[in-house]
Each structure stands twice: as C-alpha cells, then as structure tokens.
C-alpha cells in the first residue's frame, strides 16, 4: 500500500491538546505501517517550521513524531514530506532529523500502473484563472500569490533565520494561529468543480495532454474525490487534525479515501 496524508498542522496554537493531537497522528502512522511501502505527506504537517541559524529548542515538542518517522524508515518504508505554505522553510534540517525525502515542488510519479500528480496545492492555478472569478476573489488570490513570493524570497528567508528562535517563533506561530482562526470564522467549503482552483488546474492539465490518473492535493482542508474525465480523478486529502482523512493506493492501482478513527483524544 501507498498512503497519502496532509495538513496535520502540528504545533498549532489554535488546536487544543497538542500532545493528544500528535499522539493520534503517530497512531495513524503506526496503522499505516502495517502494510505501507511508502507514505507521502503532502504539506503543512507543521503549523510553522523554520530552521534558524541558532538551535531552536521549541522543535523538541515534535520529538515523538520524529521518532515515529525514523522507526518507519528503519522498517524500510519510504517517507516523503512535501513542503506546504506553513512549513516551507527547511534547509536540510528536516531531512537530517527524519531521514525523509523532502519535496519542495509538485511531482509526478508512476505506481502500480497509475500516474499520480502530487502537490500540497498552494498557488496552483489554471493559466486563465482570472476569467473564473469576480474582482474581489481575484484580489484575494493575488494577495496570496504575493505572500507566497515573499515567503520564497531567499534574502528574506536568510534574515528571518538570523532571528533568535524565541522571536521568530512568536511571529511565525502567531501568524499561523491567526490564519487558522480566520479559517474557522470564515470557512471556505468546496466551490464546485467550475470554480475550485485545484480542480480547474487539473482539468487544464488534462486538456493539455498531461494525463494523470490521480491528482492528489492537500492545502484546502476539504475531503474530495471527484471524477474530472473518464480516467482521471482529483482527490483532496482533508486534514489530520479534525477530519483525519487519508488516501491509500493498493497494488491494483485503486485509490480510496478513508477517515482515521483511532483512539479518542484525551
């Protein structure tokens, strides 16, 4: 089996009982390890991740999660971690700690006779995306894209890494909490297949002849399995803090969505 999950947002100040949240995620990974060949984590596994030039003691809170990933790797399970828009600031440290292969951009893989396009999903738009939305929505998307450019600016990344971790984390985790609370207050449900950016992106890829059997995304915190052509589907992974959604690909090439129940959080 190959498993896919995303958006755990570990360390979030907006998620109560953080240790119980991390424990349930570890239990979920242990369940997957029973028959997993590979596990793909498609971004935002951390609510905020920055690798400073000075040692960051706050990352100790993730030690149980790191230990589980190393244990999975020792069992021969291939671990892949994609960066998201909350945890893109890794410069080799995350790989060193976990042994996972880190992906900074979308990738296409071939498994069990199927072609899969994997991405966190932030910033993926069809080329003519402005034709689909009114001015208010276009402005919102443009703001996000500008922010994404700032986050990826190497000079600004260097300067932020120079900050004492205590100050940087206060800024980073505070920003992430504000973003999460805003999402709770103003949820953005599925927009429909004619307006959902990632669905439009996948449809355009198919029209251009870039066929994939499955497009698998995180980012949107919605659970979705949508047929966009007779032989192509878009799958969105929900999250791993509320919905506890994951997908698995069996050796016949069948992809299915599931919700992990696990033990009740205490």
Which residue stretches match the model-derived regions?
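Beta-strand-turn-beta hairpins that frame and shape the catalytic cleft
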Residues: 1-3, 109-117, 228-233
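Short, well-ordered, mixed-charge alpha-helical segments that flank or form enzyme active sites
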Residues: 88-92, 118-119, 125-128
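Core catalytic region of metal-dependent phosphoesterases/phosphodiesterases
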Residues: 5, 10-111
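Histidine-centered divalent metal-coordination motifs
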Residues: 9, 85-86, 120, 218-221
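A structural signal for the main folded, soluble domain(s) of proteins
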Residues: 1, 9-12, 31, 260-266
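Structural motif
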Residues: 4, 40-41, 118, 216
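Conserved beta-sheet core of the metallophosphoesterase superfamily
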Residues: 97, 101-105, 122, 126-138, ...
């Amino acid at each position: 089996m190959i498993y896919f999950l995303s958006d755990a947002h570990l360390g979030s100040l907006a998620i109560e009982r953080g240790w119980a949240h991390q424990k349930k995620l570890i239990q979920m990974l242990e369940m997957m390890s029973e028959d997993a060949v590979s596990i793909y984590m498609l971004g935002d596994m951390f609510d905020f991740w920055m690798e400073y030039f000075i040692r960051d003691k706050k990352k100790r809170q993730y030690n149980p999660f790191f230990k589980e990933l190393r244990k999975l790797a020792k069992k021969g399970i291939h671990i892949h971690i994609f960066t998201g828009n909350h945890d893109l600031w890794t410069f080799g440290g995350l790989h060193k700690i976990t042994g996972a292969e880190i992906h900074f951009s979308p990738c296409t893989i071939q498994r069990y006779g199927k072609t899969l396009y994997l991405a966190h999903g932030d910033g993926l738009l069809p080329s003519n995306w402005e034709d689909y939305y009114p001015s208010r929505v276009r402005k919102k998307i443009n703001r996000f894209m500008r922010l994404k450019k700032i986050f990826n600016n190497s000079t600004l990344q260097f300067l932020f890494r120079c900050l004492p971790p205590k100050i940087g984390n206060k800024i980073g985790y505070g920003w992430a909490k504000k973003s999460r609370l805003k999402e709770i207050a103003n949820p953005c449900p599925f927009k429909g297949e004619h307006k959902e950016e990632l669905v439009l992106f996948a449809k355009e890829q198919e029209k251009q002849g870039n066929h994939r059997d499955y497009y698998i995304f995180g980012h949107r915190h919605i659970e979705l399995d949508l047929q966009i052509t007779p032989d192509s589907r878009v799958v969105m992974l929900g999250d791993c803090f509320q919905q506890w959604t994951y997908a698995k690909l069996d050796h016949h090439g069948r992809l299915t969505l599931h919700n992990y129940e696990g033990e009740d959080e205490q």
